[in-house]
Structures are given as C-alpha cells and as structure tokens.
Amino acid sequence: MENFRYEIESMLQLVGVDMDVISVDPYSDEKLAEFVSELLLWNKKINLIGKSTEKSIWSRHIAESLILLPYVQGSTVLDMGTGAGLPGLPLQIVSGSNIEMHLVEKDQKKVSFLKHVSANLNLKNIRIYNKQFTEKGFDGAPLVNVVTSRALAEINQLVAWADPCLVNGGSLVLIKGPVCKAELEKFEESDLSDKYENGEIVEYKIDSHDVNIVIIKKK
C-alpha cells in the first residue's frame, strides 16, 4: 500500500488521537510493507491468517491492530496468543522504541515466523515466548501494564490467563467480535471480576467492518 503514513494518520485521527502525542517510527511505512510481504509469503506454508482475508490484509489485519495504538503508548505490553504477531507486531513497528512488547505464542511454527520477521525488521524492545498460557501465567512471564489479545478466547478466559502478568492499575485491551457485550456481562458476574473495574466497549468501523475494543482495568 503506497503512502501508508497517510493511512496511519487518518486512522488515528478517526479515533480522536492527537498525532503530536503519538510516537511513530519514521521507517514504519517500509517496515509495515515488509511485514505484510513476509506474512503473505509464510502464509503459503503455515496458517497465519485466513486465506479469505489476504486481499484485505491492510484493513482487516493491519489497521485493526493499529486501533490499539492510543491504548499502549509508553507501555509494557504482552500480546497473548499473538499468532502471526497481530496486533503486537504492527503496534511495535509503528511505535518503535516507545513500547516494550512481549509476544506469547504456543505454536512453534508461528514462533519461527515471529523471530524471523522481528530479526529482518531489526525490531527493538521485543521478546518472543514459545509458551502456553495457564491461569498461573507461564514460566518466565513478565509483569506488564497492558495485555492485548485478538480473536483468542472468551473474556472470562482471557482475564484469567492475563491476571498473573498484569500489574494493579494495568488494563486488558482486547479486540473482540460482536458477542463481546454478552461475554463482558458474563465476566462481570464472575468472582475474578472483583479485582477489576467495570469494562468498557469502544466500537470502531474499518472499511464497513465492525471492530469492538474491550478495555478492562485491574484495580
């Protein structure tokens, strides 16, 4: 996609973000293009994204990841079940050294892709873990102030997995589908919800595609 810097700025303006307070890597255009190229190449060998979404990769995967940018600035971030590095890698590419990113993925083949593309793009402040999440976290898990996830599990399960890694005052920032309201209500009736403030749902639309961001802050 040509002139993706314009696309980034337009998207951030759409969500009401002042570009003057957002750190954007000056080489993010080229790095995002290379990331997409590598993702499509590797997708021929291993299942990183759905084949039907390849043609809309910029809106369906990249832009959808980057709507989290306002919520992670200056943070230590853990991306649970990152898969192809979504949303973690686009956030890290655009933010540069402004955030510290931890990517967690249990599939060894996907981890190989994450390590390959991170090295090729010379990404800094990033760690990759080949680990399985449990409700006790995982061996070597960092403490972070933001946990992200995209299309991984229900909110109840995501909070249980994230809780050991999330500091008090930190937040889960989750990309969810249309059933997120029911999932959030179910979580707020659970015992674990006592440790968290009431969740918030922020709705976005990208190229007629509805995207819901669920934000849950730990007390």
UniProtKB/Swiss-Prot annotation:
It is found in: Cytoplasm. It is an enzyme of class 2 (transferase). Pfam families: GidB (PF02527). S-adenosyl-L-methionine binds at G81, L86, R150. One of its GO terms (cellular component) is cytosol. It catalyses: guanosine(527) in 16S rRNA + S-adenosyl-L-methionine = N(7)-methylguanosine(527) in 16S rRNA + S-adenosyl-L-homocysteine. Disulfide bonds: none annotated. It comes from the Bacteria. InterPro entries: rRNA_ssu_MeTfrase_G, SAM-dependent_MTases_sf. Its EC number is 2.1.1.170. Keywords: Cytoplasm, Methyltransferase, rRNA processing, S-adenosyl-L-methionine, Transferase. GO terms for molecular function: rRNA (guanine-N7-)-methyltransferase activity. CDD domains: AdoMet_MTases (cd02440). Its main location: cytoplasm. Belongs to the methyltransferase superfamily. RNA methyltransferase RsmG family. Specifically methylates the N7 position of guanine in position 527 of 16S rRNA. This is Ribosomal RNA small subunit methyltransferase G. The gene is rsmG.
